[in-house]
C-alpha cells in the first residue's frame, strides 16, 4: 500500500504539472525557430479546446524497492485529457482518464478526474474525492508567481529539424529552474499541501515539439529522470513518452462527472484517514 501511494503521488504530481503548466512556446536561438515559435505561441494562447493523448513508459527503482527485493519495475501510463473554454476559467471544464499498468500488478490502476463548476473530482482505487478549486485565482496566481522565471534561463540547447512535412524543435529544460518552477506553480495552485514535494527532484529533461505545416503543435515528446525522497527512502523514475494533440483547434466535448454527490469532500476524507493512518494517504 505504501509503495502504491508513492506511485499515486508521482502520478498526482505529474498530472498537476501537466494540467497547470499550459504548453508555452519559448524563443529559440536560431532566427528560423524563433519565427516558428512566435507563430506557435500565438496559436497556443488562442487555443480554447484540447484533446490530448499521453503515453509514457516509466522505469522505477530506488532503495524503497530494493528493500522489497525488487531491482526495478516497469510501468506504462496512458492518459486522455480533454479541456474546453481554456481561455475562460469561469467556464472551463476538463476531464482526465489515466490507465497505469505495471510489472507484477494484474489489474491496471484506473484514475479519472474532472474539473467543473469550481470543483475538482478524482475517482481512483475505490476512492472518490472532491475539492473546491478556483481555477481563475490559480491561473492569476500562477501567472504572477512565474513572472520571475526568465525563459532564457529555463531552456537551452535548441535544435530545429524536419520530420516529414512537420518541423521539430528540440530543447533541454534546466533542472534547477524546472524544480523551482514546479514548486512555484503547485504552491500558487494551493496544491503543495496535498503532497509533500520537498523531496521531489527532476533532472535530464529533454523535450521536442512537433509542429505541423499550419503551425500547430501536434505532439510533445519528453524524457526525464525524477526522484522522490521521503522519510529517508528514495524512489527513482525514468520517464519517456509523448503527448499527442488530436485535431488541434477543433471544438472538444468534455464529459461531465457522473453522480457528483457520491464524491466525498477532501477535508472530511483527510480528517478521517489522517486520524486512522497518522499520515495523509491520498496522493
Label every PLM stretch briefly:
Residues 5-27:
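Sec-dependent N-terminal signal peptides of Gram-positive bacterial secreted proteins and lipoproteins
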Residues 27-283:
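Subset-of-secretome marker
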Amino acid at each position: 500500500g505504501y509503495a502504491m501511494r508513492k506511485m499515486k503521488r508521482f502520478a498526482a504530481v505529474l498530472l498537476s504539472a501537466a494540467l497547470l503548466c499550459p504548453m508555452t512556446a519559448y524563443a529559440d536561438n536560431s532566427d528560423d525557430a524563433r519565427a516558428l515559435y512566435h507563430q506557435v505561441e500565438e496559436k497556443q494562447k488562442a487555443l480554447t479546446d484540447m484533446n490530448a493523448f499521453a503515453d509514457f513508459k516509466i522505469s522505477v527503482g530506488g532503495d524503497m524497492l530494493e528493500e522489497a527485493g525488487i531491482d526495478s519495475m516497469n510501468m506504462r501510463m496512458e492518459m486522455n485529457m480533454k479541456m474546453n473554454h481554456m481561455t475562460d476559467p469561469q467556464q472551463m471544464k476538463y476531464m482526465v482518464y489515466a490507465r497505469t499498468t505495471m510489472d507484477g500488478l494484474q489489474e491496471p490502476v484506473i484514475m479519472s478526474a474532472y474539473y467543473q463548476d469550481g470543483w475538482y473530482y478524482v475517482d481512483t482505487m475505490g476512492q472518490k474525492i472532491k475539492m473546491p478549486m478556483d481555477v481563475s485565482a490559480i491561473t492569476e496566481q500562477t501567472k504572477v508567481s512565474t513572472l520571475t522565471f526568465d525563459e532564457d534561463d529555463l531552456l537551452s540547447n535548441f535544435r530545429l529539424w524536419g520530420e516529414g512535412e512537420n518541423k521539430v524543435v528540440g530543447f533541454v529544460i534546466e533542472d534547477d529552474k524546472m524544480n523551482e518552477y514546479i514548486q512555484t506553480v503547485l504552491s500558487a495552485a494551493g496544491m503543495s499541501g496535498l503532497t509533500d514535494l520537498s523531496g521531489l527532484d527532476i533532472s535530464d529533461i529533454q523535450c521536442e515539439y512537433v509542429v505541423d505545416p499550419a503551425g500547430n503543435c501536434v505532439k510533445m515528446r519528453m524524457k526525464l529522470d525524477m526522484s522522490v525522497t521521503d522519510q529517508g527512502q528514495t524512489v527513482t523514475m525514468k520517464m519517456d513518452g509523448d503527448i499527442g494533440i488530436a485535431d488541434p483547434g477543433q471544438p472538444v466535448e468534455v464529459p461531465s462527472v457522473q453522480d457528483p454527490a457520491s464524491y466525498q469532500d477532501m477535508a472530511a476524507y483527510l480528517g478521517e484517514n489522517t486520524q486512522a493512518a497518522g499520515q495523509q494517504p491520498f496522493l
